[in-house]
Amino acid sequence: MAARAAGSGGWEVVKRSRRPGASSGGRGGGGDRRALGEANGVWKYDLSSPIQPTSTLYERGFEKIMKRQNKEQVPPPAAESKKPVNKKQPKKVTAVASQNQKQGPFRSLEDALKALDVAALQKELDKSQSVFTGNPSVWLKDLASYLNYKLQTPRMEPTLSQYPHDYPYSLVSRELRGIIRGLLTKAAGSVELFFDHCLFTMLQELDKTPGESLHGYRICIQAILQDKPKIVTSNLDKFLELLRSHQSRPAKCLTIMWALGQAGFTNLTEGLKVWLGIMLPVLGIKSLSPFAIAYLDRLLLMYPNLTKGFGMIGPKDFFPLLDFAYMPNNSLSPSLQEQLCQLFPRLKVLAFGAKPESSLHTYFPSFLSRATPSCPAAMKKELLASLTQCLTVDPLSTSVWRQLYPKHLSQSSLLLEHLLTSWEQIPKKARKCLQETIQSFTLTNQELLKKGSGSNEHVVTCDTACKGLLQQARGPRPPWARLLLLLLVFAVGFLCHDLRSHSSFQASLTGRLLQSSGLLPVAQQVCAKLYSYSLQSYNWLQETLPACGSYLLAVVQPSLQLAWTYIYATFSFLSAYCASYLAFFSDSLAGVLQRVQLPEALHQLFHSLKELLLLFYHSVLLPMWHLLLAALAQVQEHCHEACRGEMTWDCIKTQFSTAAHWTWLCLQDVTVAFLDWALTMISQQ
């Protein structure tokens, strides 16, 4: 029977030829019970060493308890003692009478664990080990069945998302943990098959209505994977096929994902293996995606130090995650996309590994191919930042870019423009390599423009960006014009100071330097020529400027007078009506404040503000306006009186000289006053 059961993937019903009721499936006089082996549901894979279908001591004590779970018909114990079906099976013993009473479910798992008699569990396990000395798989199945039967609560959702990651094992007492771990150590060779037994029993219970709660099996699974997570990670293909076979049953899929995910909470490497091998392939399925992303979030938060996960995520896994996180209208909801985007920086750290300076060039082609002008703004920002990181960290990325440049002009134009705007943030060590790459791009652009390819627009954009980058790489040009002007002013100032200090050119330092160097005759010739040219220019201005000025004044004066009249009228109008509008605004504000019934402090604040504005208007704005008008009128009258209505060179020269002399005197007075004040303050100190 065991051989047939192992070959068919399930357990057969035990039949008695002398009891017709048993062969027809009717109820026999011996009562119903559930055999332990029925938890082994149909599995796509053949187990290498199937569990022998041996009855357990614990189940014999519950023949009357499990009548509602009618899976097999078995004759009563008295009939079996007379004519057993299999002589190899040991003689059955009756269970303790106190355990034959069915208990109802507890309100919570905490209450169920408090009510659990650990001594009774140990007693049952000792009996099982004494009866089935050579079959440790039966011991383990007795443990799981006992715990699951005693820990009955209202059924929870499959992923236990409202509880900590180690629930329900975190509620187990130290004594019970010792019993579970001790039994797992004794039956170490059957632990992997025991994990399969717990998983498939959970899946079978989900088919029942109402089924049992699964806390006992969950506790056993967590206890197994705390010490042996490789039971899951060494068989990922097998479990992925199991998951896909139940894809139409979300509750079963989530139960499988929860059970396999327990392997990741003791080791980051094993957790990433589970997520990449089990949960990433189903990412995008509406019912499974929330748990997959929540598991990844919890996994990355549990391990702040990601060094143990380096090398687990490669380009093959990284870029599908990038598309899921940033591409719109994919199978993830916006909230899940946002959650995945928040995890993406940590995923980048895991993907780039411990030595990004030697691995980033492998990511560069996929980053560049996705950076199209039509990609979403958030994705474009992430791609450009990642491409810049590749170019600045891994020197081999520039050589990869050179190979891809002619076939990725639109993407390269975006990257070049981004580099142009962020050139100052690029490290100086990477600028030299980038400068050489951009120079090669300039030559490529010229060749493409000569050929006149269909993507001329992108070539022109790339060429413009390359020229701008090269200009920035070479640095800003020196301001030669400003430097020459500054040098000229300094030379003139030094010469004037030298002549004034020595009262003559021959005694000055400049004169003596020119005379000793033999350049004095040349300097005299240059000065003579400059003087003659200056005199000619002066004579020309003396003859031309009065005539031009008079003509210009005759032409422009009517228009200027008309414009002045309009400007004066406009400002007078604004000045006249400004007070009325301010008064209207003040009255309106006062009425509003009275209707609104603001606090007294706000009334006082607004009243003070109104008084301040009126004071500023009457004390500052109006006097300044009148002073400006008076000053302009005085300037006009002074010019008219000084020139007597005619623009002559002597008049212009006199006015400029007077203004310059007055300005110079004012500057001297201010400078002397400042120096006196400074000396006074220094002497007081």
Swiss-Prot record:
Keywords: Acetylation, Apoptosis, Endoplasmic reticulum, Glycoprotein, Membrane, Transmembrane, Transmembrane helix. It is a multi-pass membrane protein. One of its GO terms (cellular component) is endoplasmic reticulum membrane. Coiled coil: none annotated. The modification N-acetylalanine is found at residue 2. Pfam families: TMEM214. This is Transmembrane protein 214. It comes from Rattus norvegicus. The gene is Tmem214.
